[in-house]
């Protein structure tokens, strides 16, 4: 089971994702450096969680649309 992200992590991650969508990749290390440059994070743990959340969103966005269409067909 994975960890649940707090509201603050999600809010900050969503804002960074919307503002810097063109710079975000599916590579965690690159996203971690981006978060370090963009946000003045008070701890390494929070920075890493934000970077992980952004990476996960980027991977979800890069998934093919066909997968979601198949899921919709199964639900009907």
UniProtKB/Swiss-Prot annotation:
Entry keyword set: Ribonucleoprotein, Ribosomal protein
GO molecular function annotations of the record: structural constituent of ribosome
GO biological process: translation
Any one Gene Ontology cellular component term annotated for this protein: ribosome
One Pfam family linked to the record: Ribosomal_S17e
Family to which the UniProt record says this protein belongs: Belongs to the eukaryotic ribosomal protein eS17 family.
HAMAP family, sorted: Ribosomal_eS17
Name of this protein: Small ribosomal subunit protein eS17
Lineage: Archaea, Thermoproteota, Thermoprotei, Sulfolobales, Sulfolobaceae
């Amino acid at each position: 089971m994975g960890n649940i992200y707090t509201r603050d992590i999600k809010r900050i991650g969503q804002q960074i994702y919307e503002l810097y969508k063109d710079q975000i990749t599916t590579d965690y290390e690159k996203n971690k450096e981006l978060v370090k440059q963009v946000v003045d994070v008070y701890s390494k743990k929070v920075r890493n969680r934000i970077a992980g959340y952004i990476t996960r969103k980027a991977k979800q966005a890069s998934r093919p649309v066909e997968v979601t269409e198949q899921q919709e067909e199964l639900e009907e």
